[in-house]
Design a protein with these regions (language model features):
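Short helix-capping/linker turns of helical repeat alpha-solenoids
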Residues: 73-76, 89-90, 95, 108-112, ...
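Ankyrin-repeat and related helical/solenoid repeat scaffolds used for protein-protein interactions
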Residues: 165-233
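Hydrophobic face of amphipathic alpha-helices that form TPR/SEL1-like repeat modules
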Residues: 82-89, 117-124, 152-160, 189-196, ...
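Canonical positions in the second alpha-helix
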Residues: 69-71, 105-106, 140-142, 177-178, ...
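N-terminal leader/linker segments that initiate helical-solenoid repeat arrays
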Residues: 2-74
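Structural signature of tandem alpha-helical TPR/SEL1-like repeats
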Residues: 57-66, 93-102, 128-138, 165-174, ...
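Terminal, low-structured helical/coil segments at or just beyond the last alpha-helical repeat
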Residues: 222-255
Length: 255
């Protein structure tokens, strides 16, 4: 990872990316999402969920399963994704609609979590045979609709050359979009780009602290740990006593 971290540090040194925290909003169904010109690739009926890190779906709240199903039947994309998540988590479907059918309906309406999940399933199913164009399209669409993890996934794919041709410029472009969409993990990647071991790039502990702080405010506990390390080792500027007290309070127990 050294080379890309060096590139991040060199390109972002002295620049600040505005922090725009991400919140997935409940939305009314949107028109069916346009498909790429390539042939459509649909997930199989019973994919293997074991190696797929699915995003957390919104909870039912005070609604019953029957109420959520009624909303899904009426075209509510979020409810459709909630049913997918419910049945994919091991609950037996009490109708003839499998989990994947609800996922497909939600994705076709442009629901960001459904687009992201569908893309991950397609990538997992293809393995080392390359990434379906629809999966890339779905990740881009999910990111455009505010789900920052989709941009981060695209960053990793193009950085690692996993199923696509590795491209540093493309990877960094998606990383920047993830930051702009409020991804704490993306800010943390940039923070590490200013630390030793970044492949020969500039070392700037204050810049590392700045980006780690943005990541921490977006919920990254790894960023909190990095901040504490920088302060304990007197690597960053500031009143370390007060800052350490504050950030140690932000560190949640791991158990």
């Amino acid at each position: 990872m050294g080379n890309i971290l060096s590139s991040i540090a060199q390109r972002l040194l002295g620049r600040k990316v505005e922090c725009q925290p991400h919140r997935t909003q409940r939305r009314t169904p949107s028109p069916t999402i346009a498909q790429p010109s390539c042939s459509t690739v649909r997930p199989q009926a019973s994919p293997n969920w074991t190696h797929i890190d699915l995003p957390q779906a919104p909870t039912f709240g005070m609604r019953s399963l029957a109420e959520v199903r009624a909303e899904a039947e009426n075209g509510d994309a979020e409810a459709q994704y909630q049913l997918f998540d419910y049945y994919a988590s091991g609950h037996k479907a009490d109708d003839d609609r499998p989990a994947m059918e609800w996922l497909t309906k939600a994705a076709e309406q442009g629901y960001p979590l459904a687009l992201y999940t569908s893309a991950l399933i397609q990538i997992e199913e293809k393995g080392d045979k390359g990434i379906p164009p629809q999966a890339i399209f779905y990740l881009q669409a999910s990111g455009e609709r505010g789900f920052s993890d989709a941009y981060l996934q695209l960053y990793h794919l193009y950085y690692e050359g996993k199923g696509v041709e590795a491209n540093e410029d493309t990877a960094l472009g998606y990383l920047r979009q993830a930051m702009e969409a409020g991804s704490g993990a993306a800010y943390l990647i940039v923070a590490k780009g200013f630390l030793p071991g970044n492949g020969g790039g500039p070392i700037d502990y204050d810049a590392a602290y700045y980006y780690a702080e943005q990541a921490a405010h977006l919920g990254s506990q790894q960023a909190v740990e990095l901040i504490i390390h920088l302060l304990e080792e007197n690597l960053a500027s500031g009143d370390h006593t007060e800052l350490l007290t504050y950030w140690r309070r932000q560190l949640r127990p791991s158990h």
